[in-house]
Amino acid sequence: MPPKGKGGKGAKGAAASGSGDSDKKEKAQKGGTAVKVRHILCEKHGKCMEAMEKIKSGMRFSEVAAQYSEDKARQGGDLGWMTRGSMVGPFQDAAFALPISTMDKPVYTDPPVKTKFGYHIIMVEGKK
């Protein structure tokens, strides 16, 4: 029988608590708990694809949002900081999967994400 603290149940407990730390690190690498999001929302797929063509042609994301988005258009599509659980499923999955990008060089969802609200072109400006 091994002495207490060397092997046995004690080692298992230590390993289990160690894995808890790596779970936290994994969560942080997958996008943390909040994202700073901009989006362009269009009820019709065709209008959303028009907006995407404008972005691809070099137009700024915020300008396209102001022209095409049916939600928050006056703020250039800026939704601010959004936390996990505050967005609809497909939107949240896409937002946390995107890398951080800038207005001049946006990385966005292509094809647009479909939700109950319509079609979204999503861009992430920050993560925490």
From Swiss-Prot:
Family the entry assigns: Belongs to the PpiC/parvulin rotamase family. PIN4 subfamily.
Gene, per the UniProt record: pin4
Catalytic activity field: [protein]-peptidylproline (omega=180) = [protein]-peptidylproline (omega=0)
Domain PpiC per the UniProt entry, residue ranges: 32-126
E.C. number(s) listed in UniProt: 5.2.1.8
One GO term describing the cellular component: nucleolus
Gene Ontology biological-process annotations: rRNA processing
One Pfam family hit: Rotamase_3
Main location: nucleus
Region (Disordered): 1-34
Protein name: Peptidyl-prolyl cis-trans isomerase NIMA-interacting 4
Subcellular compartments: Nucleus, Nucleolus; Cytoplasm, Cytoskeleton, Spindle; Cytoplasm
GO molecular function, one term: DNA binding
Keywords: Cytoplasm, Cytoskeleton, DNA-binding, Isomerase, Nucleus, Rotamase
Described purpose of this protein according to its UniProt entry: May be involved as a ribosomal RNA processing factor in ribosome biogenesis. Binds to DNA.
